[in-house]
Structures are given as C-alpha cells and as structure tokens.
Amino acid sequence: MPYLLRVELPDVPGSLGRLASAIGEAGGDIEAIEIVEKRLGGTAVDDVLLETIPGTMPDSIVSACNGLDGVRVVWISRYAAGGNLFLDLEAVEALTDAPDQALDRLVEVLPITFRADWAVRLHRVTGSGAGTENAPGNLEFCDLEAPSRLEFSEDDDNLYAGARISGNEIVVIGRRGGPEFLDSELARLGHLVSLAVSIATV
C-alpha cells in the first residue's frame, strides 16, 4: 500500500539517512523523497513516498519518525496517484505538449503535482468549468491577485489553494484533511498557472 508522508526534520547532514532507517525498521520501503520547503529555522519539510510491507500499520511508521530527535510527522495518508511522484518538470512537459489545451492539461496535472485530491477551474459568470474527478461543483469564484489559501464556509473537510488564470477565471486545488498548503507550494502553483496561461496564449 503506497503512503505519502510529510515530515519536518532538521536540515543537517544525516537527517534523511536517520529518517530512512527509522522508516525501514518500522516496515516501510521508501520509493521517493522530495524536498518541499526549506525553512529559516534550520528545518526542512520533505514528502516521502513509501510502500508498506503487508501487516505494517502507518501508525508504527509515524511513531518511528516522531521518535527521532527534531523530527515531526506533519501528515500521512494513502497515496492513490499510481505510486509515482509527478514533478514540476513533468507538469511543464504536459503543458507544452499541447499548447491549445494547456489550461485543461493544467487542471489534470495539478492534483498529482501537488498531492491534492482534485482541481477545478472557476469562472466568474459560469461557475465551475473543467475539473478532475471528485472536484466539488458548488464552489464560488473569488477574486485573487496572488496564489492564496482559500476558505469556503460550507466545507470544513477540505483545504484549498487557488491562483488566478485571468480576471474572470481562477483554478482551485483541494486536499481532504490536509496537509496545509505551504508558502512554497503556493509559489509553485502560481508559476505553473502563469506558465499555462502564457503557453495557451502563444
């Protein structure tokens, strides 16, 4: 069973090695690690994609990680995206492969790129547009000047982030239950949306 683990750890040599050893001893097999954010206080936030051996409970992996000095598990969840981390460069490639479909492709790749559950385009007048499976159909358009975390009053289960496509259209991505979208992820979202817009208008 693939899991995605988001962990905060000291940004010092040897930290990843200790983390990998703890995960392995608890019954997890690491398939990929991606640095999500480096923080000023000397810590880093990493996403770890791992497989568990049969019979291993995710709680045991969380406990093993939290038992390390300076390490804190932010979030763990089953990861349904085919067991592959989809990096930003692959997202860019998907956008440039079909410039006339760049905005639709953007919606398709955002959930995988950001470990989100869904993505949807919202228009000021017509409401929900292109969206992935499980995207809610009742979200309302909101004006955005910069990529931002969003809140919708009717839903407490999802965490949202959005970015402006144009004055009349935005894209929103959502995660059920977490983790929270980090500032570095908002910046990446803004860059990818801007790139998709520029590709679509060439």
Where are each of the predicted segments found?
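A conserved regulatory-domain signal marking ACT and ACT-like small-molecule sensing domains
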Residues: 1-97, 109
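Helix-loop-beta substructure at the N-terminus of cytosolic sensory domains
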Residues: 99-129
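GAF sensory domains
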Residues: 118-176
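Amphipathic alpha-helical "output/dimerization" segments
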Residues: 181-197
